Amino acid sequence: MLLAEFVKAGTKALESLYPQKEARSIVLMLCEEVLGTENYTHIVEPEFKIDDKKLPELEAAMERLKKMEPVQYVLGHTEFYGRTFKVDPAVLIPRPETELLCRDAIKLGMRVYRMRSPYGKNAEPVRILDLCTGSGCIAWTMALSIPGSRVPAVDISDAALEVAAGQDFASELKSKETFKPEFIKADVLDSEQEIELGPFDMVLSNPPYIMESEKEDMRRNVLEYEPESALFVPDDDPLLFYRAIARWSQRFMSPEGVGLSEVNESLARQTETVFKAAGYAHTEIVRDLSDKNRYIIYHK
């Protein structure tokens, strides 16, 4: 079978589920993974023939995609902040929007690092706490971006912690002489549990924040495949994770520390009220490139 034929047929098979451009992109991602082709190979090499030994793998993957399983789960990985992260249905697929939080957190963390660097080997490392870590994308990004940083990361799910701890960045850790995040099982909603942590320069989180009533506006590939516990909160108490994050911050973040947490764009102002009530007088809602409320920064 010609690659061009497969791309055309695969795109058509997914067009009832996705816009044509997205359907085509998904098929090309699959071909790149299985065949090692580029997204233009079928155009510049119209006679490119798919190895018969590879066809069963492509066809099996297409069957999963036709059931609207996210392509990231089918491939077993996704890109985040310039790195490849393993993902499976135990963890939320990292979104590009979360890269904005990481970008700004790295800027803040590097500012602390530069302030301390004149002390050389005696300098205190930048300490960062990641709550609701999921795939570990935030924790790993911070650990690999801020030299010598210490990054404990918390989640309640054993399966998620296994994915997070299993991310393969050993060579980058070694080349940068930095430290692997420490992945800890704990319930973020239980901020009083016995746990030795802190003090932290930053507390970061991408908690569940989508209200149950918002499900009707969401795609099937999210609702049927991504973990509900990482996405949804009850309509009658949608801010419960933010109250918990505020308590963790009160308990473990240093007085000079800064917190950053993703928010539900429709509940940003209410979320801001939670942190102000917890004693964080300085808050800011940061918008993304689509001008949507994306995350909150809070500090004393």
Show the residue positions of the predicted features.
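Non-catalytic accessory regions of SAM-dependent methyltransferases
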Residues: 1-35, 40-43, 50
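Conserved hydrophobic residues forming the short capping helix/wall of the S-adenosyl-L-methionine
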Residues: 14, 109, 168-172, 249, ...
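Residue-level signal for inorganic ion chemistry
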Residues: 30, 68, 98, 138, ...
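Conserved AdoMet
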Residues: 31-108
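Active-site beta-alpha loop architecture of Rossmann-like, nucleotide-cofactor-dependent enzymes
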Residues: 72, 210-213, 266
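Conserved SAM/SAH cofactor-binding pocket of Class I
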Residues: 100-217, 244
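Mobile active-site "lid"/loop adjacent to the S-adenosyl-L-methionine
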Residues: 209-240
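Conserved Class I SAM-dependent methyltransferase catalytic core
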Residues: 235-298
